[in-house]
């Protein structure tokens, strides 16, 4: 039924609580108190979440800013720091290997490496791979730490970088590297088994194209699925997400690494390493680098420096350059190499630090 002035009678649900007959005052007070409590709780939760997000964004920005330049990343080791203050390992990370993963690899291998020297990793700049800049970072660290003995570990393509840096250090600064370990390192682009994507990355990089995260994410997932027999599905997902993290190697760095591999010519550095010793370790089951051609090429080109090229990382999974995942496979191999070519002083079980 209508009412005066053309207004319809409101439904019960449209009447405010204050206008409802029979609503006790205690109920109104309870509803008000509940609303007040909810608002305070929601406000505090929202403020806390916003604070955490802001802190995370600030930390991420700081980390990204730090990675605009090449840096040497020391890994603390009480034993090595005390007994070998003048010697250091430098780990040159492989393709798409982050700063965190490089340090993780050193931590995995510390039981073998810390018997000869301290530990440090080379963090590549997210602005792109620049050998001159890496050489500067290394020599500045050498001088600051007063190092006289340098040991290089080339992880996958990092073996190429380690070799060139060693040659440049001797040529420009007169600093000779003691030992270079090549872990599953390709000698040239021809040793890389998957040429299709490799060529495309270099082609686009040289024309100034930079991969967006969405395209890169699809590739990262696809690449690992292809080699799913070497990883669990959990590892596939974790490694793909790591590559899409804000602190992962940038697309620019990855593309420049691809171009470096594509044009690398190891013969340019043969005969330019002085008395440095070299050793190649790898796995015949490697499905990323063609092991047989790579090890033979390195052994021939650096015949004067190569002291070992027959030790295998049998049982490692993935088979290609995986010391972080397989320290129990890698440490005995490194122990054998170092004991043979850099034997520790024999003088009993106690060593005195002077």
PLM region spans:
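Serine-hydrolase catalytic core
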Residues: 227-307
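Catalytic active-site module of serine/aspartate enzymes centered on a nucleophile-bearing elbow/loop
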Residues: 310-354
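N-terminal export leaders
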Residues: 38-52
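Conserved alpha/beta-hydrolase
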Residues: 110-127
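Active-site nucleophile loop of the alpha/beta-hydrolase fold
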Residues: 181-191
């Amino acid at each position: 039924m209508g009412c005066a002035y053309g207004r319809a009678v409101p439904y019960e649900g449209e009447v405010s609580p204050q206008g409802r007959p029979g609503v006790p005052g205690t109920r109104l007070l309870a509803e008000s108190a509940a609303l007040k409590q909810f608002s305070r709780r929601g406000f505090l939760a929202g403020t806390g979440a916003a604070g955490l997000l802001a802190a995370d964004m600030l930390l991420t920005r700081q980390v990204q800013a730090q990675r605009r330049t090449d840096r040497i990343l020391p890994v603390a080791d009480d034993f090595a720091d005390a007994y070998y203050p003048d010697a250091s390992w430098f780990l040159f990370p492989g393709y798409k290997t982050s700063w965190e993963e490089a340090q993780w690899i050193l931590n995995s291998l510390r039981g073998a490496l810390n018997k000869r020297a301290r530990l440090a990793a080379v963090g590549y700049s997210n602005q792109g791979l620049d050998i001159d800049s890496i050489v500067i970072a290394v020599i500045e660290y050498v001088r600051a730490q007063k190092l006289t003995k340098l040991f290089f570990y080339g992880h996958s393509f990092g073996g190429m970088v380690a070799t060139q840096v060693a040659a440049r250090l001797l040529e420009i600064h007169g600093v000779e590297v003691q030992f270079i370990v090549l872990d599953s390192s390709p000698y040239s682009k021809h040793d890389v088994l998957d040429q299709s994507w490799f060529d495309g990355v270099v082609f686009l990089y040289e024309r100034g194209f930079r991969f967006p995260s969405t395209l890169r994410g699809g590739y990262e997932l696809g690449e690992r699925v292809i080699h799913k027999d070497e990883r669990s599905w959990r590892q596939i997902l974790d490694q793909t997400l790591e590559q899409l993290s804000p602190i992962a190697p940038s697309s620019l760095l990855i593309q420049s690494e691809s171009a470096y591999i594509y044009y690398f010519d190891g013969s340019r550095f043969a005969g330019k390493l002085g008395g440095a010793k070299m050793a190649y370790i790898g796995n015949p089951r490697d499905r990323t680098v063609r092991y047989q051609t790579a090890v033979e090429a390195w052994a021939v080109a650096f015949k004067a420096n190569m002291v070992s090229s027959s030790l295998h990382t049998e049982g490692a999974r993935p088979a290609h350059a995986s010391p972080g995942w397989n320290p129990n496979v890698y440490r005995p191999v490194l122990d054998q190499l170092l004991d043979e070519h850099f034997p520790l002083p024999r003088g009993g079980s106690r060593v005195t630090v002077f």
